[in-house]
Design a protein with these regions (language model features):
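A polyanion-binding, active-site-adjacent surface
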Residues: 1-173
Length: 173
């Protein structure tokens, strides 16, 4: 992956933020700019966050894989596994109160699961890293929603679920 990419796309936003949003992998524009969720995908993400009164700069955003896959293909299982431990270390360093996984690659990297997002999205799960428990919710990625706009209604439900979790945990954003 590294040889195909121009930049490593690490993260962006508030490293002290209470929410960590993890996408799948950079695309062409993200690779060029060196920051996650750019262009139409970034615009949709910003709108999604603002719909529940969250400003993008208040949260921390990264990817499960930090290099762009060739021709924007879906990352392969061995590539996801290779970056999984790095991602988990990244989570421990940022130490958020809530984690949102956007897309199947992010879900597979954290949970080592090939479940369908349609079956797991919107449900709160947990992961324990270095003796710390993190609440996690999986939802569709903005790039998927741009390709399948009829799924936006499900993401809206997930966003409302996130908003409620923020209230329940008394997180100020």
């Amino acid at each position: 992956l590294k040889m195909n990419s121009k930049n490593i796309v690490m993260g962006d936003g508030n490293v002290d933020g209470s929410i960590m949003l993890i996408g799948e992998a950079p695309g062409l524009l993200e690779d060029k700019v060196g920051k996650p969720f750019q262009g139409d995908v970034g615009s949709l993400l910003n709108k999604m966050l603002l719909a529940i009164n969250i400003k993008r700069e208040k949260i921390y955003i990264t990817y499960a894989l930090n290099f762009r896959p060739p021709e924007d293909r879906k990352p392969l299982g061995h590539e996801i596994r290779k970056y999984s431990e790095f991602l988990k270390e990244h989570i421990s360093i940022i130490d958020p109160k809530i984690i949102i996984l956007m897309g199947s690659t992010a879900m597979e990297a954290v949970f080592r699961s090939n479940e369908k997002i349609s079956e797991t999205r919107g449900k709160w799960k947990e992961i324990i890293l270095k003796n710390k428990t993190y609440p996690i919710m999986v939802t569709f990625s903005p790039s998927y929603l741009l390709r399948f706009p009829d799924k936006k209604k499900f993401s809206w439900e997930d966003l409302k679920n996130l908003r409620q979790k923020i209230r329940d945990l008394k997180i100020n954003i």
